[in-house]
Amino acid sequence: MMKSRFCPSPTGLMHLGNARTALFNYLFAKSKDGIFLLRIEDTDVERSKETFDLGLQEDLRWLNLEWQEGPGADEGNGPYHQSKRQAIYDDYYQRLEEADQAYPCFCSEEQLRLSRKIQRSAGKPPRYAGTCRSLSAAEIEKKKAEGLQPALRFRVPDDEVVVFADLVRGEQRFQTNDIGDFIIRRANGTSPFMFCNAIDDALMGVSHVLRGEDHLTNTPRQLLILQALELPVPTYAHIALIVGPDGSPLSKRHGSRGIKELRDNGYLPLALTNYLARLGHYYASDELLSLAELAKGFNVESLSKSPAKFNAQQLDYWQKQTVNQLPNDDFWEWAGSELQSQIPTDKDDLFLTTVKPNVSFPRDVAYWVNVCFGKTLNLETAQSELLRATGNRYFEEAFEAFKKFGKDLNSVVSHLKEKLNLKGKPLYQPLRIALTGAEHGPELAKLILIMDYETIQNRLQEACQ
């Protein structure tokens, strides 16, 4: 059975790049009636935190990316936290050492740094120089007796080519002479990503590894490990990374935020999944799609090789589409029951049909609740100046027109046009700002029907002051 996986490190909060990788793996699995696996790669003891671990799982559940295998869903391949799998890795280290495919390395970080510097100055790519590659058993024991703790390096074969088919990028070829022997166990005994990631994919039956292109150069190393241990090799697909509009790595200055922050600000999970699913993947439909529909339309061949540019406006577009299709009960659960409680029952439906297409976040709903039912508006300086420049007569005539015609906006506007000889923006804008505090928004005629007559009178009187 097809099995994809998402394996974050709990060293920070989930960001958009993580979320997109998780989403693509989820959609890939669902498109093939496969299994989506979650594994927590927490071998970085110093930086890994339980709060981040739980936060990552909470974010995935909020996005409705439920895993069929992983923490809380053991299918016999656990544990699913790498910090609890060290005995498994130690067994494979022993196998590699016994087969002379790995050897202890006593080089200090200072020695390695100097070696890299010399190689770069000679115009060569930095790789391990092989200082400890041919140490005898006696030399190894002597160094250990001196109290030196070795790392363990994988012995990369010379003069070979590692070839694999990437589902996104086609055939990939790497010369082993360019790779160099690499560390598979740190001197402190812990396992780095390179090793345990590959071992776990094989042991957990992962058939497809879909990950960022920043892992592309890790793949030949992991293939060498799996081949040396005669373990199953998954199919790889390396997706383009998300970048800012200027092509630089995505950051907060581009408007990128963590999933928790987006959730706290009122973004909806379906908005995020619709945006992220299209960020580097083509969908024929430009309609808001459910997760099941996104999965049905997902195809690895539709993934772009080019970097995907983050666009905050596009994310907000999908947010607005998602809000607009929310059932009324879900809308108020999202916006907040305390806001709903401020709306008279007989005006609830009219408020929703009028305001819903114009809001994207709970703060927008709060704004229009205050417009329709609040006592005062907080005008910006420019708006106050516009009302002053309009002059009191405009608002006095508007006051009289509402007394005469009630909430018939067309008649009120016709009255102002006739009395003041106005048209266009000078005719409509002052009235909208005086009544709503906004230059744009829901249809004014409908907002007026929602407002109490007293509210309309008070705001016109305030505009005269």
Swiss-Prot record:
GO-annotated biological processes: glutamyl-tRNA aminoacylation
Positions of disulphide bridges: none
Pfam families: Anticodon_2, tRNA-synt_1c
Name under which the protein is recorded: Glutamate--tRNA ligase 2
SUPFAM superfamilies given in the database record: An anticodon-binding domain of class I aminoacyl-tRNA synthetases, Nucleotidylyl transferase
Keywords carried by this UniProt record: Aminoacyl-tRNA synthetase, ATP-binding, Cytoplasm, Ligase, Nucleotide-binding, Protein biosynthesis
Family: Belongs to the class-I aminoacyl-tRNA synthetase family. Glutamate--tRNA ligase type 1 subfamily.
Enzyme class, first EC level, given as a word: ligase
GO CC annotations, alphabetized: cytosol
Catalysed reaction equations from the record: tRNA(Glu) + L-glutamate + ATP = L-glutamyl-tRNA(Glu) + AMP + diphosphate
NCBIfam families attached to this UniProt entry: gltX_bact
UniProt xrefs under PROSITE patterns: AA_TRNA_LIGASE_I
Chain positions of motif 'KMSKS' region: 249-253
Entry binding sites for ATP: K252
Span(s) of short sequence motif 'HIGH' region: 8-18
GO MF, one annotated term: tRNA binding
Top-level taxon: Bacteria
Record carries keyword Protein biosynthesis: yes
Organism of origin: Coxiella burnetii (strain RSA 493 / Nine Mile phase I)
Subcellular location: Cytoplasm
Known role: Catalyzes the attachment of glutamate to tRNA(Glu) in a two-step reaction: glutamate is first activated by ATP to form Glu-AMP and then transferred to the acceptor end of tRNA(Glu).
Quaternary assembly: Monomer.
EC number: 6.1.1.17
Chief localisation class: cytoplasm
